[in-house]
């Protein structure tokens, strides 16, 4: 097997062309390609190009909406909700993070709730964006347990219910 080296721009272009060819609109493809490129740049190979086949599979199956429009609703001064319309979470977060940051700065604390989206990407880009705005952030998801295995992971001998 041979190794192919790609520049960060080539990674972005490859990801974007692939996503566009498989049902994403330009905005969605750009957001996801940026995420893929940055994960590769940061050395997180499990969240870079490695994720592209899963994105394509979800798009082809119709599970992931590559052209969906998110709906943002301000529930209260500190609670923002974004209806994801089956888009991938990074696309939904792109819509909600600016309003979340604004609410947190105005009120001292804020929560962003996302419904009907799919998450299979890195979670630190969102917290990094908020940290760059001088905020503290926590990111959580309800994705499958043990989504990323660790080298010395041991499983419990008893099931905890």
Model-derived regions: residue spans:
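Short, well-structured alpha-helical segments
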Residues: 26-37
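Alpha/propeptide regions of enzymes that mature by internal proteolysis
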Residues: 37, 90-115
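Short coil/turn connectors at secondary-structure junctions
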Residues: 76-79, 106-109, 132-136
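Active-site cofactor/substrate anionic-group-binding motifs, chiefly glycine-
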Residues: 51-96
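Generic N-terminal amphipathic, Lys/Arg-enriched alpha-helix
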Residues: 1-22
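Glycine-rich anion/phosphate-binding loop at the beta-strand->alpha-helix junction
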Residues: 111-153
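N-terminal and secondary-structure boundary signal
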Residues: 20-23, 42-46
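Single conserved hydrophobic/aromatic residue that forms the stacking wall/gate
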Residues: 152-161
């Amino acid at each position: 097997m041979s190794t192919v080296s790609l520049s960060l721009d080539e990674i972005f272009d490859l990801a974007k062309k692939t996503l566009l060819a498989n049902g994403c609109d330009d905005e969605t493809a750009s957001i996801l390609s940026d995420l893929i490129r940055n994960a590769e740049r940061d050395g997180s190979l499990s969240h870079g190009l490695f994720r592209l086949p899963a994105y394509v599979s979800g798009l082809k199956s119709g599970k992931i909406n590559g052209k969906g429009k998110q709906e943002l609703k301000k529930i209260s001064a500190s609670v923002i909700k974004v209806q994801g319309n089956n888009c991938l979470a990074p696309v939904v977060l792109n819509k909600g993070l600016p309003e979340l940051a604004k609410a947190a700065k105005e009120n001292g604390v804020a929560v962003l709730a996302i419904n009907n989206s799919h998450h299979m990407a890195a979670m630190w880009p969102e917290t990094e964006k908020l940290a760059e705005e001088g905020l503290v952030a926590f990111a959580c998801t309800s994705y499958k347990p043990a989504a990323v295995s660790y080298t010395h992971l041991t499983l419990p001998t008893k099931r905890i219910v």
